[in-house]
């Protein structure tokens, strides 16, 4: 068979590429393109050579030329999308993957790549239907099932995620990704011991990956095994020194273990070695703000290069720091830069509204928050700050949003199996004390002068905790039934009472004398509650010492927001309220401790099992 000159050159180029001789491969391919500029295979090979040389810009140029000549090549669109993804152009990558699927809806590679990309970009809600559609063509695609499970985890559909991971493991029992995903779903379902078993099995099978070590740290932390969690996060950073969440979790764990002098050293070691990724720097600066280290914050800030601080995420942090110092013009400049992206995180919009409130601009804050709520109607932070803005404006909608009858008090009484309330609380305190393994409060939390348990405290299969859980479940059902039966408008269009629900978080707090909670909200829930196990005695000098109060935010505003409601901490009493209500506690001085169990509830996403 007689080959043309371009064909011979391409064959020589391909042989050189296989041998790793990139310079020769590139030269022969360029000669082929000079001889035949519209030869599709030459552009395809040139792209492969560029990818091997880690030159994605050149690869994209040749892939676009190849696709102009062969627009129905799904593999070409997949390669182009992958190249865009590697070079940090997610929108272009998404368009390429979608074009590939237009050519062939059943192409598994393009669909998996698109689902993975959307999940990575924080668009799991959009990734889920794309994955589900693909499973209609390939129901045994373990990779797609795993990706679907990972996207479902982000939406807290833990039961559905577990079902998908189990299905993936039926088709590919050795899939480490599906096994680890299964562990994360179990953790989300408050089955920490089962999650730990799954992760340990992967460890014993020889898997060494930073994500495994990081997830082990998270589960061990949930279980209150903080020293072991610390070691796991250290191992995660040894395997991947660039993974920001491991730095944050390690710092948080060391702080809880009482190391408030050196808890941020891992960040500083990373910076000294030249690791200056924006998420890492933001986490460090945010931690300094959280613990009130303003001088250290300014020193650290001045040590980072200007081009790094120009990143939107860091502009958000600088805006918050300026607002806290009362430097509002500077804060607004930083906010504008942080919010310059087409769709910035809603949390940053909330920070900007917070600055507007601090600066005495509730009208601007309300307008911003109402726009943001159109993107996420159930966002608890947005509702909380909107309630403040409406209150300051005298807007009657504030009274509806903060209606007093939304705070519900129930005295639960003695659960079965216990003779008296005192006997129940004595047993409950003993079980809870075993879980208070931290030496001080988490630095990013709102309690001061006490400790907080890790993970979901209501998961514990212990007699008193189990009895309390049954009481709380009945109380929540009764409360939701009451809310559903009420006529009239809802407090807000976002305020809908769920059908199936779950505990999205539950923890115990043990405050010491002079301890208290700053004013805060619970953004992870729909309704929240606190059950009083132990309360300080009445103080003649301060009749409301240790009381729960609702109303003002944790902001020093030009106009004071009054306290709207107060509740006494009576052992055996449960107080339920919307999670977006600003609430906190007054400090107390008498007695030994103030012990509570608090929780949030959220809608429960049931599995489809299709």
Model-inferred region functions:
Residues 463-473, 477-576, 581-610:
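Catalytic core of non-heme Fe(II) oxygenases with the double-stranded beta-helix
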Residues 400-495, 516:
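Non-heme Fe(II)/2-oxoglutarate
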Residues 17, 51, 78, 85, ...:
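Position-specific recognition of the canonical hydrophobic site in helix A of tetratricopeptide repeat
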